[in-house]
């Protein structure tokens, strides 16, 4: 069973993503902020990380950049799920280590296909 770390500060969004993933037989661990997400990523070694961009404290871009700095987390693929859909945001996200950028709203299928495309 593949393990996915969900980092999302909005509880209802986090619960929706968790539901989508559990419906598709993924093991889900979650954090409501980037600092806790960093700790869980290093400890749990998920197969993929799904994160929001707009979060209080450390935002999603900075979170992704930090993940790519540390040897324990640098190889973990990252999917960003966000309402920020400007091309500039996508380009900046790619520079910070985001592998796939999904804009809200998205479907369960969109999310699962994104995971399957980067986790082998």
Spans of model-derived segments:
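C-terminal output helix
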Residues: 106-116
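Short hydrophobic/Thr-rich beta-strand motif most characteristic of the beta2 strand and flanking loop
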Residues: 25-32, 40
